[in-house]
Structures are given as structure tokens and as C-alpha cells.
């Protein structure tokens, strides 16, 4: 992992690295700067740091739980506006970084329903 981290940072001293433990809560390597967690089933509690003192991060799919657009239609939203807003408020308030995955079709179009949901939540 050390060699991979060094290669990822080559040419940009400000790059930060994480190794994804998928749905797990463990850290692959001491050379990573933040914890890269995936929400697969539930909304776990999140604090600013994990047990190793590393910056917390959670990745969440807004629509397609399989991450990759596979059909002709976009997947429905997984969460109501209230659920997603509550999740973002709680986790970001605790200092946890959050990445939202939005389904993209083969033409490059983002799921319009997900974009509309983000616009509604932003207004709150």
C-alpha cells in the first residue's frame, strides 16, 4: 500500500489517499489519510474521526444501489427528502465528509430525479 500511496501522490503534494474497505469499518494501511466507508445497508453513526483518529468519509448511493447504470430507466430514489436531509445534516455536522453517488446513463445524463431531490434539499 505504501508504494500505491506514493504513486497516487506523485506530482501533487496535496493529494490525500484512502484505500476502500467497501462496507467494512477497518483501515487497510497506515499510509492513508482518511477512512473511505461505503454505506451499503444502513446509515451508520459517524463522527469526525474513526478509532484510528482518521478523518471519516462515507459514500452513499442516492438511487442505484448497484452503483452502475444497467438498465434503460433510472433507478428510483432510495431515500425520501427528509431521510437524506437528516443523514447529511447529522454526518456533516459531525465533521464527516460525505460523497453522494448519482446514477449516470450511457449518454452521460445524470438521474434527473436525484438532481431534483438535491435541489429541494439545498433549499431547506
Give the residues covered by each predicted segment.
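Mature catalytic domains of secreted/periplasmic carbohydrate-active enzymes
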Residues: 1-124
Amino acid at each position: 500500500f505504501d508504494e500505491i500511496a506514493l504513486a497516487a501522490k506523485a506530482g501533487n503534494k496535496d493529494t490525500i489517499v484512502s484505500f476502500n474497505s467497501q462496507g467494512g469499518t477497518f483501515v487497510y494501511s497506515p499510509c492513508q489519510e482518511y477512512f473511505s466507508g461505503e454505506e451499503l445497508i444502513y446509515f451508520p453513526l459517524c463522527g469526525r474521526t474513526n478509532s484510528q483518529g482518521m478523518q471519516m468519509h462515507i459514500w452513499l448511493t442516492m438511487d442505484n444501489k448497484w452503483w452502475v447504470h444497467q438498465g434503460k430507466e433510472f433507478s428510483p430514489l432510495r431515500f425520501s427528502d427528509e431521510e437524506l436531509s437528516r443523514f447529511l445534516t447529522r454526518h456533516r455536522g459531525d465533521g464527516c465528509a460525505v460523497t453522494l453517488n448519482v446514477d449516470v446513463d450511457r449518454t452521460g445524463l445524470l438521474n434527473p430525479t436525484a438532481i431534483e431531490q438535491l435541489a429541494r434539499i439545498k433549499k431547506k
